[in-house]
């Protein structure tokens, strides 16, 4: 079977969604077409370990390696969304995969006193 050919995209955008339970990282081209995707759950972490910073770092290293090797990506812009624990470590994982981060953007949605928040946790 022939090896799949990938188009060359030197610059891309990494969209990181960090929730309390998981971290999702997708890499797209500048037009917004998704090239590769990985989550902490897809990297082999299950249960509460998906929401850890280590799970986010492993997932972002995997997706960074995919983008670098398959699409010849060198520079990446990062857009972060969500309050999760894996925000910073996901960016660190992209850097350790050999991608140069050209800018960071925080796109966390903040309500202007919209919906009532869920009840406070009692542990």
Curated annotation (Swiss-Prot):
GO BP terms, alphabetized: translation
Keywords annotated in UniProt: Ribonucleoprotein, Ribosomal protein, RNA-binding, rRNA-binding
Record's subunit section: Part of the 30S ribosomal subunit. Interacts with proteins S7 and S18. Binds to IF-3.
Lineage: Bacteria, Pseudomonadati, Pseudomonadota, Gammaproteobacteria, Legionellales
Protein's UniProt name: Small ribosomal subunit protein uS11
Keyword Disulfide bond: no
Claim: S-adenosyl-L-methionine is one of the keywords in the record: no
GO molecular function: rRNA binding; structural constituent of ribosome
Transmembrane segments: none
